[in-house]
Amino acid sequence: MIAESGHYALVLALGLALIQSIVPLIGARLRDDALMSVARSTALAQLLFVGASFVALVMLHVNSDFSVANVYENSHSMKPLLYKITGVWGNHEGSMLLWVSILALFGGLVAAFGNNLPLSLRAHVLAVQAWIASAFYLFILVTSNPFLRIANPPIEGRDLNPVLQDIGLAVHPPMLYLGYVGFSISFSFAIAALMEGRIDAAWARWVRPWTLVAWIFLTLGIAMGSYWAYYELGWGGWWFWDPVENASLMPWLAGTALLHSALVMEKRNALKVWTILLSILTFSLSLLGTFLVRSGVITSVHAFATDPTRGVFILLILCLFIGGSLSLFAGRATSLKQGGLFAPISREGALVLNNLLLTVACAVVLFGTLYPLAMEMLADFKMSVGAPFYNLTFAPLFALLLLAVPFGPMLAWKRGDLLGVTQRLLAAGVAGLVVVAIVWAWTRGGSALAPLAIGLGVFVIAGAVTDLVERTGLVRLPLATALQRARGLPRSAWGAALAHAGLGVALIGIVCETTWNSEYIATMKRSDVAHVAGYDVKLDGLFQRQGPNYREMIAEFNVSRDGETLSVMTPSKRSFTTRGSSTTEAALLTRGASQLYISLGDANAEGAIAVRIYHKPLVLLIWWGPVLMAFGGVLSLSDRRLRVGAPKPARAKQRLQPAE
């Protein structure tokens, strides 16, 4: 009965979405407030029914109801409760239900908290959201129904893919989907603006918080996925330029450009057409990512679907929304009035440069992702585009972007003083050069690329600090006055500085890990000692342990340095009998921002085992950077100016009239 309830709740959600996609538009056409208000009630009701459908699937997994095909294929009665729950979205059908649940959540949030929006705009936005929802409800019900029953129910399930039975899966996909789907709000605002033929600074003020929310979650989702791959796959890699990883990076790049473009539009009423186009392209790239994962066109640890019917259906959705939105843009963009002018050397000019570099970088990743797929489809020629391509194309573009980052916030709007900003950034530049010299001397005159990259990271961080120092007057004003100005500084200014500094932190981590990573790969027996980056790693023994739904072989390593024992590390290999597969569970020793990493291979008949030991200097900075960026986004989001909607004109103060 639970399965049937979940199914019919999804059908009712589809019916509500169809009503929401039509009636409010009729109301907007007729200027009927009652019909336009239908969008709000149907969006909230739709959220209720989709939420009920998702809860029903969770209950089926928790109860191990193997009469439902989705539960049978992806669960097991002995699986821990946490992984029963996360197994709901560890498969194609369940993950698509999570996708539409988050889509309904964002629509419900606009309905609930969009009271400051003009009624007509809110009706259009929610109608566009309903178009998207209707398409994906149909996709789930026709090709990917998670509530299908099995005629002769088995007594036990096949279990979830062992690689996905990890705490990271509880966090990574939901965060990623909150980012992917969150950009649908920016898309809907853009289409609504084109339909109404009106876009102004108020529109940018309304759309920026929703874009920022999606960007925060996508940033954290990508970082969490990278860290999950790092510790779960067993060989210490954190980014593989996998097509599905690229599919999450592309909307992040476009979304970052959109945030900065919307800022120009809000402050200077400029870049209107470009901001609308970015809103469309960002969500289009999210849809492309959905197609790559769900269509079966690629083979990846991230990919689920192999049914060609699903791929064709999603391709049709992709063509419908991307093609339709770009056609509407082409027809209506010329009617949008252009905003204010600005000099090339200005904050607007810096943000345009930011958008140019981010867009070109996104195009490079798009080419590297789709070109091999196109070659395989058109010429039956299999090829891959890996790190060497991106190191030669993407990395220089991002280096230029990082070099420009400290200048943007310090330039004035409309017309800036580049020489003056350069002088104010002199201390940050000197700090970067000093670090370059120190690192180059420490590496004894090796390649200059790594020291230069680290110096660039320091320059970005110091530039963010300099911006805050200049805004507060910490150097030129009395301390009490500077602190008072710091308290009055908008949270968005603090957030922007933290986000920019996070980029520098991540760059330093990436450079240190890739340049000075130490590796030891060998077969070890009991009492053997490996020497890695000053650490002595001794294998004390192997033992077996029975887990809830797996058998585990654990190796015990004693780790010491200069004769002092630091830790006992216990990496393992788990064999899952139900699936007949195994996973590697790495052991990590964290010291500061660096880590010692041990993973196991196969054991032989003599009792020896293959071992990988890595020392990864400052590797945690790779993920601390995105966390700092996301925190900066949250701080900006908490700024009251991003929560109250469009600014209202100040009322003129009434003068006191003398008594007659």
From Swiss-Prot:
Keywords from the named record: Cell inner membrane, Cell membrane, Cytochrome c-type biogenesis, Membrane, Transmembrane, Transmembrane helix
Protein known as: Cytochrome c-type biogenesis protein CycK
GO terms (BP aspect): cytochrome complex assembly
InterPro entries: CcmF_C, Cyt_c_assembly, Cyt_c_biogenesis, Cyt_c_biogenesis_CcmF
Naturally occurring in which organism (per UniProt): Bradyrhizobium diazoefficiens (strain JCM 10833 / BCRC 13528 / IAM 13628 / NBRC 14792 / USDA 110)
Record localization: Cell inner membrane
Membrane topology: Multi-pass membrane protein
UniProt similarity note: Belongs to the CcmF/CycK/Ccl1/NrfE/CcsA family.
Function summary: Required for the biogenesis of c-type cytochromes. Possible subunit of a heme lyase.
Organism superkingdom: Bacteria
Primary location group: membrane
Residues spanning the membrane: 8-28, 42-62, 94-114, 123-143, 175-195, 210-230, 233-253, 273-293, 311-331, 350-370, 392-412, 419-439, 445-465, 492-512, 617-637
GO molecular function term, any single one: heme binding
GO cellular component, one term: plasma membrane
